[in-house]
Amino acid sequence: MVLRQVMDFAQAVEHLLHPAVVSFNPHPRSFFSGRTQPLLTPLPEKAAQLTAIGIEQLVLLPFTEKLANLSPKQFVQSILVEQLQAKFISVGQDFCFGHQRRGNVQDLQNLGQEFGITVAIAQLEQTDTERISSSRIRRALKEGKLAMANHLLGRPYALRGTVVQGQQLGRKLGFPTANLCLPADKLWPKYGVYAGWVNLNALDVPIPAVINLGDRPTVNGQEPSAEVHLLQWSGDLYGQGLEVALTHYLRPETKFAGLDQLKNQIAQDCQQAEKLLNLDGAIP
């Protein structure tokens, strides 16, 4: 709703203004806690998504102690008016700003009138009896409730990264995998096995896949890995960028007694994924 209001306003003034999204870097929670905040959409992913819907600029405000200490009026005057020259602003109904989040949407509208900025307030989107929020989506992903997370997002949760060299264990088991290097600040869903679709730059159609996320306890893995086995497709993916849309959560991460048991389970995972993704024909 927030982005739709921005795009509608830009079209109404015949694009005399540039539709933009303003965000903070680092995330305020990371700044105050001193810990990296896992993100649903890291910056490169966010930029790509915004570009796809027509947003022309992504403005990253360095979140510093000086910025955090600005009063609501100082924030509007110094940042929105003097630096960004904003003419139209859209925010959610629960938006807060300024030192210790003292400013609310009513304050923003009042300040907008003072400085000649049109302020639009987007109503909170709800599902069931709860509002849709990033915290609720994060919780669903960490609990393995992928269907709920995707419903709240309005799209499948996606992982974007570059294919890197792995241990090639999957190839030895007969199920070659593309090892995906994810951004350090990307939020990992609950470890386990997923079914989904892979978007590859070189192809126009998505490829069905089984995705394993976790520490690989059967082989005493030390670091979490994202391993993608493409169904009904083979080729060299090293160095290529992939987007993996997670559509189904199959099972939790499991430590098996040996590689034979692991191999049998992977075969079952592939069969289950084929049914869930409505694929025709046998999986190679």
Curated annotation (Swiss-Prot):
Pathway(s) per entry: Cofactor biosynthesis; FAD biosynthesis; FAD from FMN: step 1/1; Cofactor biosynthesis; FMN biosynthesis; FMN from riboflavin (ATP route): step 1/1
Molecular functions (GO terms): ATP binding; FMN adenylyltransferase activity; riboflavin kinase activity
UniProt entry tagged with the keyword NAD: no
EC number: 2.7.1.26, 2.7.7.2
Annotated keywords: ATP-binding, FAD, Flavoprotein, FMN, Kinase, Multifunctional enzyme, Nucleotide-binding, Nucleotidyltransferase, Transferase
SUPFAM superfamilies for the chain: Nucleotidylyl transferase (SSF52374), Riboflavin kinase-like (SSF82114)
Gene3D superfamilies: HUPs (3.40.50.620), Riboflavin kinase-like (2.40.30.30)
SMART domains: Flavokinase (SM00904)
One example of a Gene Ontology biological process annotation: riboflavin biosynthetic process
Domain of life from the UniProt record: Bacteria
Record field: catalytic activity: riboflavin + ATP = FMN + ADP + H(+); FMN + ATP + H(+) = FAD + diphosphate
Task performed by this protein: Catalyzes the phosphorylation of riboflavin to FMN followed by the adenylation of FMN to FAD.
Similarity-based family: Belongs to the RibF family.
NCBIfam families attached to this UniProt entry: PRK05627.1-3, ribF
Name of protein: Bifunctional riboflavin kinase/FMN adenylyltransferase
Gene (UniProt): ribF
